[in-house]
Structure formats: C-alpha cells, structure tokens
C-alpha cells in the first residue's frame, strides 16, 4: 500500500464534500433572489483509486413560486410564461439544503478522521519494518 493510494480516497472525498457544502451555501444565500435556480451536487466514484468527485449542476429544477409585484416595470429577463405583475421566486428549498449541509458535513468529518488513522497505520507498518 503506497501513501498515495491510502490517502487518495479520503482527500478526494474531502474535496467533493467541500464542493457540496459550497453549493448548498450558495443556494441558501440566494433563497430570496427572484428567479434563482438552485444548483445540485452529484458524487461520482473515481475508478483508479476509488476516490470521489463532485459534479455541480446549476440552473436546474422546477420553477419558483410566482410572487406578485406592483409598480415595477417588467424585466426583459423575465421568462415569457410569467404573467405581468409577477416575478418568479427562487426554487431553493431551505429544508432540503439544510439536510444536504448536514450530510456533507458528516461526510467531511468521517473522511477527515480517516487521514490520521491511515497515518497511524502507515507509521505502524514503518515501525515494523525498521
């Protein structure tokens, strides 16, 4: 077992869960932004060292709720399906994003604990060889 192959999976998982946390935080920061489409993170296994990679997809999901506005001119960027006097709200679901944050933080914590364990195991192996 080489040092690279032992540490590669938890390090890539830390990176992937960090990306997932950033996406959820971005979605929550824009929960009140009209027309915002929440991003989603999917995780893929990497074949060579069985690491993890995060893929971010933005601008997905259902339409947001229609919010009535009065006295504002129609924004040219507003989709044609939105009636006059309304704007499309954000499609971010706060409950879903909070659950995603909990999952990603627990995954991050678990993989962060793997690194000192691998370090200790490799230290034991080195001590046995000496």
PLM regions with names:
Residues 1-130:
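Amphipathic alpha-helical polymerization modules
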């Amino acid at each position: 077992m080489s040092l690279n192959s032992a540490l590669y999976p938890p390090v890539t998982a830390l990176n992937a869960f960090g990306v997932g946390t950033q996406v959820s935080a971005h979605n929550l920061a824009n929960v009140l932004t009209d027309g915002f489409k929440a991003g989603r993170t999917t995780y893929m296994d990497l074949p060579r060292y069985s690491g993890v990679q995060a893929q971010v997809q933005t601008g997905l999901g259902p339409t947001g709720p229609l919010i009535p506005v009065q006295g504002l001119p129609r924004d040219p960027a507003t989709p044609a399906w939105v009636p006059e006097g309304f704007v499309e709200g954000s499609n971010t679901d706060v409950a879903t994003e909070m659950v995603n944050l909990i999952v990603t933080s627990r995954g991050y914590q678990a993989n962060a604990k793997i690194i000192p364990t691998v370090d200790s195991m490799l230290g034991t192996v080195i001590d046995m060889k000496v």
